[in-house]
Amino acid sequence: MARTPVRQHLVEKGTQVFLERGYSGSAVQDITAAAEVPKGSFYNHFESKEAFGGQVLQEFFSDLQRTISSTLEDASVPPVRRLQNYFAAIIETLDGQGCLIGNFSVELSPLSDVVRTELLRIFEQWVKPFQKCIIEGQETGSIRRDLAPDLLADFLIASWQGAILRMKIERNREPLDQFLTVVFEALLPSTENISNES
Protein backbone atom coordinates (compact mmCIF):
# COMPACT_ATOMS: atom_id res chain seq x y z
CA MET A 1 0.00 0.00 0.00
CA ALA A 2 2.96 2.31 0.55
CA ARG A 3 3.35 2.82 -3.19
CA THR A 4 -0.37 3.41 -3.78
CA PRO A 5 -1.81 6.88 -3.07
CA VAL A 6 -4.51 6.77 -0.43
CA ARG A 7 -7.15 8.21 -2.76
CA GLN A 8 -6.57 5.59 -5.44
CA HIS A 9 -6.39 2.84 -2.84
CA LEU A 10 -9.77 3.90 -1.46
CA VAL A 11 -11.26 3.85 -4.96
CA GLU A 12 -9.90 0.37 -5.69
CA LYS A 13 -11.13 -1.10 -2.42
CA GLY A 14 -14.39 0.82 -2.61
CA THR A 15 -15.09 -0.68 -6.02
CA GLN A 16 -14.84 -4.17 -4.56
CA VAL A 17 -17.01 -3.24 -1.58
CA PHE A 18 -19.70 -1.76 -3.85
CA LEU A 19 -19.64 -4.85 -6.09
CA GLU A 20 -19.98 -7.17 -3.11
CA ARG A 21 -22.52 -5.23 -1.03
CA GLY A 22 -24.10 -2.67 -3.31
CA TYR A 23 -24.03 1.07 -2.73
CA SER A 24 -26.76 1.19 -0.08
CA GLY A 25 -25.31 -1.78 1.76
CA SER A 26 -21.86 -0.19 1.99
CA ALA A 27 -21.01 2.32 4.70
CA VAL A 28 -17.99 4.61 4.59
CA GLN A 29 -16.63 2.57 7.48
CA ASP A 30 -16.81 -0.58 5.33
CA ILE A 31 -14.77 1.14 2.64
CA THR A 32 -12.12 2.49 4.99
CA ALA A 33 -11.91 -0.88 6.75
CA ALA A 34 -11.33 -2.63 3.42
CA ALA A 35 -8.67 -0.05 2.56
CA GLU A 36 -7.19 -0.23 6.07
CA VAL A 37 -7.13 3.55 6.46
CA PRO A 38 -8.67 5.81 9.14
CA LYS A 39 -12.19 7.03 8.44
CA GLY A 40 -10.92 10.61 8.49
CA SER A 41 -8.74 9.85 5.47
CA PHE A 42 -11.87 9.22 3.42
CA TYR A 43 -13.20 12.73 4.00
CA ASN A 44 -9.80 14.22 3.30
CA HIS A 45 -10.22 13.02 -0.28
CA PHE A 46 -13.98 12.85 -0.86
CA GLU A 47 -16.71 15.27 0.13
CA SER A 48 -19.29 12.53 0.61
CA LYS A 49 -20.09 8.90 -0.09
CA GLU A 50 -22.11 10.07 -3.10
CA ALA A 51 -19.13 11.96 -4.53
CA PHE A 52 -17.00 8.88 -3.88
CA GLY A 53 -19.50 6.75 -5.80
CA GLY A 54 -19.19 9.08 -8.78
CA GLN A 55 -15.40 8.80 -8.67
CA VAL A 56 -15.54 5.02 -8.42
CA LEU A 57 -17.74 4.96 -11.53
CA GLN A 58 -15.26 7.14 -13.41
CA GLU A 59 -12.39 4.83 -12.52
CA PHE A 60 -14.42 1.73 -13.39
CA PHE A 61 -15.23 3.14 -16.82
CA SER A 62 -11.60 4.13 -17.36
CA ASP A 63 -10.68 0.48 -16.89
CA LEU A 64 -13.46 -0.52 -19.28
CA GLN A 65 -12.15 1.92 -21.88
CA ARG A 66 -8.85 0.05 -21.94
CA THR A 67 -10.76 -3.08 -22.88
CA ILE A 68 -12.67 -1.10 -25.52
CA SER A 69 -9.40 0.17 -26.96
CA SER A 70 -7.87 -3.30 -27.21
CA THR A 71 -10.97 -4.90 -28.76
CA LEU A 72 -13.57 -2.65 -30.40
CA GLU A 73 -10.98 -0.15 -31.64
CA ASP A 74 -8.52 -2.71 -33.02
CA ALA A 75 -8.70 -1.88 -36.72
CA SER A 76 -6.60 -4.93 -37.64
CA VAL A 77 -9.54 -7.20 -36.72
CA PRO A 78 -12.84 -7.52 -38.68
CA PRO A 79 -15.76 -5.63 -37.04
CA VAL A 80 -17.82 -8.66 -35.96
CA ARG A 81 -14.76 -10.33 -34.47
CA ARG A 82 -14.01 -7.10 -32.57
CA LEU A 83 -17.44 -7.23 -30.99
CA GLN A 84 -16.96 -10.88 -30.09
CA ASN A 85 -13.54 -10.13 -28.61
CA TYR A 86 -15.00 -7.33 -26.49
CA PHE A 87 -17.68 -9.49 -24.90
CA ALA A 88 -15.23 -12.37 -24.41
CA ALA A 89 -12.83 -10.03 -22.60
CA ILE A 90 -15.60 -8.72 -20.34
CA ILE A 91 -16.81 -12.22 -19.50
CA GLU A 92 -13.30 -13.08 -18.33
CA THR A 93 -13.47 -10.28 -15.75
CA LEU A 94 -16.97 -11.02 -14.44
CA ASP A 95 -17.05 -12.88 -11.13
CA GLY A 96 -20.77 -13.13 -10.42
CA GLN A 97 -21.00 -9.66 -8.89
CA GLY A 98 -22.05 -8.03 -12.12
CA CYS A 99 -21.01 -4.75 -13.69
CA LEU A 100 -20.71 -1.70 -11.46
CA ILE A 101 -22.24 0.51 -14.15
CA GLY A 102 -25.31 -1.70 -14.37
CA ASN A 103 -25.51 -2.15 -10.61
CA PHE A 104 -25.43 1.59 -10.00
CA SER A 105 -27.92 2.21 -12.82
CA VAL A 106 -30.47 -0.01 -11.10
CA GLU A 107 -29.76 1.04 -7.53
CA LEU A 108 -28.83 4.72 -7.69
CA SER A 109 -30.03 6.47 -10.83
CA PRO A 110 -33.46 7.22 -9.27
CA LEU A 111 -31.85 8.46 -6.04
CA SER A 112 -28.66 10.36 -6.86
CA ASP A 113 -28.38 13.13 -9.43
CA VAL A 114 -24.58 13.02 -9.06
CA VAL A 115 -24.41 9.35 -9.97
CA ARG A 116 -27.15 9.61 -12.61
CA THR A 117 -25.26 12.42 -14.36
CA GLU A 118 -22.08 10.36 -14.34
CA LEU A 119 -23.96 7.33 -15.68
CA LEU A 120 -25.41 9.39 -18.54
CA ARG A 121 -21.91 10.59 -19.43
CA ILE A 122 -20.59 7.04 -19.35
CA PHE A 123 -23.34 5.59 -21.54
CA GLU A 124 -22.88 8.41 -24.05
CA GLN A 125 -19.18 7.56 -24.37
CA TRP A 126 -19.67 3.81 -24.13
CA VAL A 127 -21.98 3.56 -27.13
CA LYS A 128 -19.73 5.42 -29.59
CA PRO A 129 -17.13 2.69 -30.25
CA PHE A 130 -19.98 0.21 -30.71
CA GLN A 131 -21.58 2.50 -33.28
CA LYS A 132 -18.29 2.92 -35.13
CA CYS A 133 -17.65 -0.81 -35.20
CA ILE A 134 -21.18 -1.52 -36.43
CA ILE A 135 -20.90 1.12 -39.17
CA GLU A 136 -17.70 -0.53 -40.40
CA GLY A 137 -19.42 -3.91 -40.35
CA GLN A 138 -22.34 -2.54 -42.34
CA GLU A 139 -19.97 -1.00 -44.87
CA THR A 140 -18.21 -4.34 -45.41
CA GLY A 141 -21.49 -6.28 -45.50
CA SER A 142 -20.83 -8.37 -42.39
CA ILE A 143 -23.51 -6.64 -40.29
CA ARG A 144 -27.12 -6.08 -41.34
CA ARG A 145 -27.91 -2.67 -42.82
CA ASP A 146 -31.65 -2.50 -42.21
CA LEU A 147 -31.20 -1.24 -38.63
CA ALA A 148 -29.46 2.02 -37.72
CA PRO A 149 -26.01 1.73 -36.09
CA ASP A 150 -27.05 3.80 -33.08
CA LEU A 151 -30.11 1.58 -32.54
CA LEU A 152 -28.03 -1.59 -32.70
CA ALA A 153 -25.34 -0.15 -30.42
CA ASP A 154 -27.86 0.97 -27.81
CA PHE A 155 -29.58 -2.41 -27.94
CA LEU A 156 -26.31 -4.31 -27.52
CA ILE A 157 -25.37 -2.42 -24.37
CA ALA A 158 -28.87 -2.53 -22.88
CA SER A 159 -29.39 -6.23 -23.55
CA TRP A 160 -25.87 -7.04 -22.33
CA GLN A 161 -26.60 -5.30 -19.03
CA GLY A 162 -29.82 -7.29 -18.79
CA ALA A 163 -27.92 -10.52 -19.39
CA ILE A 164 -25.46 -9.63 -16.62
CA LEU A 165 -28.35 -8.94 -14.26
CA ARG A 166 -29.83 -12.36 -15.06
CA MET A 167 -26.40 -13.93 -14.52
CA LYS A 168 -26.31 -12.46 -11.00
CA ILE A 169 -29.77 -13.78 -10.22
CA GLU A 170 -29.28 -17.25 -11.69
CA ARG A 171 -25.64 -17.53 -10.58
CA ASN A 172 -24.46 -19.00 -13.85
CA ARG A 173 -23.32 -17.68 -17.21
CA GLU A 174 -26.14 -19.14 -19.31
CA PRO A 175 -27.79 -15.71 -19.82
CA LEU A 176 -24.49 -14.42 -21.23
CA ASP A 177 -24.23 -17.38 -23.60
CA GLN A 178 -27.83 -16.81 -24.71
CA PHE A 179 -27.03 -13.15 -25.38
CA LEU A 180 -24.02 -14.08 -27.51
CA THR A 181 -26.01 -16.67 -29.47
CA VAL A 182 -28.87 -14.32 -30.28
CA VAL A 183 -26.63 -11.36 -31.12
CA PHE A 184 -24.08 -13.11 -33.30
CA GLU A 185 -26.27 -15.78 -34.89
CA ALA A 186 -29.54 -13.90 -35.34
CA LEU A 187 -29.41 -10.15 -34.68
CA LEU A 188 -26.25 -8.84 -36.33
CA PRO A 189 -25.49 -11.04 -39.35
CA SER A 190 -26.20 -9.60 -42.75
CA THR A 191 -28.47 -11.57 -45.07
CA GLU A 192 -26.95 -9.92 -48.12
CA ASN A 193 -24.81 -11.83 -50.56
CA ILE A 194 -21.55 -9.98 -50.07
CA SER A 195 -20.02 -11.40 -53.22
CA ASN A 196 -22.68 -9.61 -55.28
CA GLU A 197 -21.99 -6.23 -53.74
CA SER A 198 -20.16 -3.72 -55.85
From Swiss-Prot:
Pfam families given in the database record: TetR_C_13 (PF16925), TetR_N (PF00440)
| InterPro entries assigned | Homeodomain-like_sf, HTH_TetR, Tet_transcr_reg_TetR-rel_C_sf, TetR_C
> Which molecular-function annotation in GO is an example for this chain?
DNA binding
Question: What keywords is this UniProt entry annotated with?
Answer: DNA-binding, Repressor, Transcription, Transcription regulation
Give start and end of each HTH tetR-type domain: 4-64
Q: Which PANTHER family match?
A: HTH-TYPE TRANSCRIPTIONAL REPRESSOR NEMR, TRANSCRIPTIONAL REGULATORY PROTEIN
Q: What does this protein do?
A: Transcriptional repressor for the dhaA haloalkane dehalogenase gene.
* Protein name per the record: HTH-type transcriptional repressor DhaR
User: Which species expresses this protein natively?
Assistant: Mycobacterium sp. (strain GP1)
- Lineage start: Bacteria, Bacillati, Actinomycetota, Actinomycetes, Mycobacteriales
